[in-house]
């Protein structure tokens, strides 16, 4: 019985960890946040500001891991960049 409870607890913990999202950060216009001419570590800092676990410059835009669900990330299906 203790083993079953431990197993279920582990599954719940894994479910909590997996719920983090990842993706390209967006600027105020809905475009991917550019890192083309930014200094090294810029994307990592921007991701940390958004409460992400890490990030890097996936040329030419910032890509983040471990973002909370409330952070909006760029999506091809809902892309509004450059459109009015």
Swiss-Prot record:
Gene3D superfamilies xref list: Knottin, scorpion toxin-like
Protein name: Toxin Tb1
GO cellular component, as recorded: extracellular region
The species this protein was found in: Tityus bahiensis
Cysteine amide sites (modified residues): 81
Signal sequence bounds: 1-20
Pfam families: Toxin_3 (PF00537)
Subcellular location: Secreted
Lineage of producing organism: Eukaryota, Metazoa, Ecdysozoa, Arthropoda, Chelicerata
Keyword field: Amidation, Disulfide bond, Ion channel impairing toxin, Neurotoxin, Secreted, Signal, Toxin, Voltage-gated sodium channel impairing toxin
InterPro entries: LCN-type_CS_alpha_beta_dom, Scorpion_toxin-like, Scorpion_toxin-like_sf, Scorpion_toxinL, Scorpion_toxinL/defensin
Expression (tissue specificity): Expressed by the venom gland.
Principal location: secreted
SUPFAM superfamilies reported for this sequence: Scorpion toxin-like
Similarity comment text for this entry: Belongs to the long (4 C-C) scorpion toxin superfamily. Sodium channel inhibitor family. Beta subfamily.
Function according to Swiss-Prot or TrEMBL: Beta toxins bind voltage-independently at site-4 of sodium channels (Nav) and shift the voltage of activation toward more negative potentials thereby affecting sodium channel activation and promoting spontaneous and repetitive firing. Is lethal to mice.
Cysteine-cysteine disulfides: 31-81, 35-57, 43-62, 47-64
């Amino acid at each position: 019985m203790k083993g079953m409870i431990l197993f279920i607890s582990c599954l719940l913990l894994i479910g909590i960890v997996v719920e983090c999202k990842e993706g390209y950060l967006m600027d105020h216009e809905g475009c991917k946040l550019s890192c083309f001419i930014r200094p090294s570590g810029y994307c990592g800092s921007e991701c940390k500001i958004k409460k992400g676990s890490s990030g890097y410059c996936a040329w030419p835009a910032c890509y983040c891991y471990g973002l909370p669900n409330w952070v909006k990330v760029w999506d091809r299906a809902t892309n509004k960049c450059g459109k009015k």
